[in-house]
Amino acid sequence: MERSPFPHSGPLEADEVTGRDDEAADLVRLLGGRVPVALVAPRRYGKTSLLRRAVWLLDQVEPTSTIWLDLYGLSSVSDFAVRLDRALSRTTGRFREHLDRIAGGLSLNIGIVSAELRRSARSGPDPTATVHALMDSLGRTTEHHPTVLVIDEVADAVGVGNVLEIARSHLQSVYRDMGLAFAGSKPTMMTRLFADTDQPFYSQARRMELEALPVDAIVEVVHRGFASTGRHAGPVAAAIASFGAGHPQRSMELADGAWWLTEPGTGADQATWEAALEAVRVRSAPALRDFFGVLSGTKQAVLRAVVRTGAPFAASEGRFHDLSNSSITIARDALVDEGHLRTGGGTTSLVDPLLADWIARELP
């Protein structure tokens, strides 16, 4: 059975990432040069996929071990210890052998920290001491093996115990021995993390914004995907690029929908595009409705105003929703920080084109 050339569910494999060659090259240069990077972009914008490609490319030049530490929804120091242990337990080869020897000398067994921490408070290990031991083991191992540490959704660790302080205390001595990438989807929090003097990682990483995909990149990806499977994209490629507004995941979701409606040896047309768009609309509507429904009334009003007028401060919208400028400002800033709105060049727009489309069609 044929497989769609437009995967869009979850992070992509390194060889599936397209349209980000320049960004991948920049990351390879920085990580290979041991320059810490803070990669910022909305969720589902391809941060993890891009980092996978970058470390894969780096590995072609210099065999490198990569540790992936995901801090999304981090809740406690114990939670951090478990996630770090899980990330380290996925390593293999000589890196893992060296890591196990060092950890063993600290009476630490990589891979079973979760079970140990879930024992009773009296018999279980101290979470903070465990994090110190894990970070020490990692740092000492990287002195002997080229390593990249990727910390995803790092902003979720802000205010969670002292995990960032502990991490900083161990990483500062091995900055020149490892590539270090911080990734996050909350722009304001990422700025605070690396720009506020009271934060442990103040001025410790070069910020890199992941922008929307250019129109020509999306058009090329769609045409190439169709052609690789004996199909012609026709006008669908341009329609996807226009509707998708540079959103990588949504653009590929639309391309996938159109591809399945196009038989091998044929070409897509306007009818294909309309059918694909309608199918994606129907499939995504329940999730969009649920997402919108849990927002505060003010946030809902701001999103509706942006869709209708391109600005959250339109006087007519403020009167219509009975909102003050101050409440609109607070809601807008929160939506920007959460990655749902983007601003720049005097304009404001929704990050998710399907959400914007749903609001425009469903709400007055």
For each of these PLM feature ranges, what is it?
Residues 191-242, 263-266:
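Helix-loop-helix "sensor" segment of P-loop NTPases
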Residues 36, 121-186, 195:
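Conserved Walker B catalytic segment
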Residues 33-36, 40-45, 49-147:
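P-loop NTPase nucleotide-binding core
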Residues 354-364:
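Short, amphipathic alpha-helical interaction segments positioned at domain boundaries
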Residues 336-346:
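A short, conserved structural fragment
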Residues 321-338:
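Short amphipathic alpha-helical interaction segments
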Residues 252-325:
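Winged-helix-like regulatory helical subdomains adjacent to P-loop NTPase cores
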Residues 1-37, 42, 60, 354:
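A short, basic N-terminal segment
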